[in-house]
Each structure stands twice: as structure tokens, then as C-alpha cells.
Amino acid sequence: RIPYDRENTSMVDFPMCGYCEDQYTDLHNRRHHAQTISCHGCGPQLLWKTRDAACDMTEVPEGMTDDEHRTRDAAILDSAADILKSGGVIAFKSVGGYNLVADPLCDEAVHRLRIIKKRESKPFAVMFRNLDEIRSFSYISDTEAKLISSSARPILLLEHRESDSSEINRSRFIGSFLPSFAAQYMLLDRISPLIFTSANLSDMPMIKDESDMFDMFEKDPLIDGVLYNTRRILLRADDSVARVIDDQPQMIRRSKGYA
């Protein structure tokens, strides 16, 4: 809805604490009327569900300090990265829905992901930490670099360089993209690159709700964990896909960032 006010977004579930409200109402503060303003104390919380209930972090203790929140979040991301480094597959809650995440350089992980998705041969999109990492796998022009770095963060089809990875060499092009929000950046700081593909069965809608994701997690033992948060997803939005032809961007799938 318009205007883009907090009460019309999923942030309505997170009342501002006094510290955030002071900044929100201060005409001279850079966060004045920033509708998504929040902190560790009053904003969405990172949560983690695994096959081992003893390792779950599905609740946030009350009264935690900012440093304690940061330590807890780091522990969650470390645990998720450890699973990915060992060839596992996790579900990850992104802005517009859940993704399934795996290491594209690990044949076992890719094989497991194909079984989960019932997707025998179609290549997966790969998220890279930064442009330098993309350049180590693909050829990328200035126009392509500008598009892939834009705020819309589309998946961009790039011609790949030769690589030892069968997954990245599966097609002439790699569907490449960059992280678009903090949790993705922090996960890729721990392991990169990573396959990010929609959490669904082929030809089914992308999962956006915890109930559906947990149901899939319980039914499919090949998914090792669910990394999620307490912010509701109101509108499902998959990543947009584009390609640059004759130095002109061409949309293949118009969705997040463009729709």
C-alpha cells in the first residue's frame, strides 16, 4: 500500500524501542522516518532449526545485550556454514521467500539438492560474495557489472570461464548474482560461492511461510537445517533474471526489484 508507512508493512509486528523511536523522530538523524528502523532489541530475530534439537536456536532469551545478540547470530551463521562446508543443504529465508542453499563446488551437495527439487539437469543460480569472485568464474562486462550490482540484485546470465566444477560448467552460462541483505552477506563471508534456489518442488510456488517450510523440512531428510527470522513475508517474490545482449539489459524473468 502507499504511502510506504510502517503500519502497512511487515514491520508493523515490531514496535520501536525508545532508542529507535528517538532516531525515527529526530529531524536531524539520518534514520528520521526510516520505516524499517529497528535494532537487535526490537527488530526481527535470526532463528535456526536443525535435525538435532539440542543445537536449535528457535527462541530468543529476553534481556540480551547487543553484544549477546551479535554473538548468538554469529553462532547461528557459523553452524549453518559448517553444514554447507560438509556437503549439506539448508533452507534460508530471504526477502521474498525461502531458498535452498548448497555448495556448487561439492558434487554431493548438488546431487542432494537435485533430489530435493526433483530437478535432474537444469542449472542452478549461484550467489557470489563480490564482483571479484564472479570474475574468477565468469566473463563480465562493465554493463553487466553495473546491472548485477544494482539495488534490484537480479540473477544475470554470464558466460563462464573453464572451471573444475561440473555444476558451474553445466551450461555455457552461469546464473550469477550478489547478496542483497545482511544475513546473505554474513553467510557468504563464511562460505562462498553458494547455490541459492527457490525452496519448492519444480513447477510449484516458492515457499514463504514457516509452516510450509517446516513441513517440507520434516518430510525431507536431505534438508539439514532451516535458517529463518521472525519477519513475515507478505508477498512472495522470486529473484529476477536478466541477460545483457549487445550491451543492452534484457529481462528474462521480471520479479523482485522490478515488478
Q: What spans do the regions from the language model cover?
A:
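Active-site-adjacent structural elements in enzyme catalytic cores
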Residues: R1-A259
